[in-house]
């Protein structure tokens, strides 16, 4: 038991060291004699309790804020780095996030019966949004990509499908065949 307490204390000290970067937290720590790590954990705990209770539907808002703020911050950082790996992580995240929100919009009646849905959604969004877990890529490859390939016929190389291009071209050709000589459809090849 003593070993667990020591590990928790070490983790809290590491959190305090990381939070030294934020002047507002340092000032708050001076005003109230509580370590920054305890303030952060208290805020996070209160945040999750509000999501859990979902009073007045606030769980949905707080869940979406968690799904926007943390990955949004990392996305802005990723835009400033020269590599592509982090860009791919967050582009994938936003595709999964949007897919989840569209699904959620159309299934409110079903979600009403799922207890603590927004608590689970928040945990899921953090799982797919935090880079150390790689959850967005996993969900994308397992669910979103196969669904997109089936519904939109996206080819593995990532570009528009050849059959979709062919269908669009045949629609243009069919339209042009019905236009009298000398008139233009306004569509350029």
Curated annotation (Swiss-Prot):
Required to generate and maintain the structure of the tubular endoplasmic reticulum network and the vacuole. Induces high curvature in membranes and causes membrane tubule formation. Involved in membrane/vesicle trafficking. Its main location: endoplasmic reticulum. Oligomer. The gene is YOP1. Keywords: Endoplasmic reticulum, Golgi apparatus, Membrane, Transmembrane, Transmembrane helix. It is found in: Endoplasmic reticulum membrane; Golgi apparatus membrane. It comes from the Eukaryota. GO terms for molecular function: membrane bending activity. Residues 1-35, 79-88, 128-189 are cytoplasmic. The short lumenal loops between transmembrane domains 1 and 2 and between transmembrane domains 3 and 4 may impart a wedge-like configuration, thus deforming membranes. InterPro entries: TB2_DP1_HVA22. Residues 56-57, 106-108 are lumenal. One of its GO terms (cellular component) is endoplasmic reticulum membrane. GO terms for biological process: endoplasmic reticulum tubular network membrane organization. Belongs to the DP1 family. The chain crosses the membrane at residues 36-55, 58-78, 89-105, 109-127. Coiled coil: none annotated. It is a multi-pass membrane protein. This is Protein YOP1. Pfam families: TB2_DP1_HVA22 (PF03134).
């Amino acid at each position: 038991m003593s070993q667990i307490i020591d590990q928790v204390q070490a983790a809290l000290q590491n959190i305090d060291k990381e939070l030294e970067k934020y002047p507002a937290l340092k000032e708050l720590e001076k005003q109230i004699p509580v370590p920054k790590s305890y303030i952060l954990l208290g805020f996070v705990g209160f945040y999750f309790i509000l999501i859990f209770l979902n009073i007045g539907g606030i769980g949905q808002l707080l869940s979406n804020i968690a799904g926007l703020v943390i990955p949004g911050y990392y996305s802005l950082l990723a835009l400033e780095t020269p590599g592509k790996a982090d860009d791919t992580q967050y582009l994938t995240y936003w595709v999964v996030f949007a897919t989840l929100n569209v699904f959620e919009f159309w299934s409110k009646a079903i979600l009403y019966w799922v207890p603590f849905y927004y608590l689970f959604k928040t945990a899921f969004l953090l799982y797919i949004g935090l880079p150390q877990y790689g959850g967005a890529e996993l969900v994308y490859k397992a669910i979103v990509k196969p669904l997109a390939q089936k519904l939109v016929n996206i080819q593995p190389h990532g570009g528009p499908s050849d059959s979709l291009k062919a269908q669009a071209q045949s629609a243009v050709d069919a339209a042009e065949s019905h236009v009298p000589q000398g008139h233009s459809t306004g569509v350029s090849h």
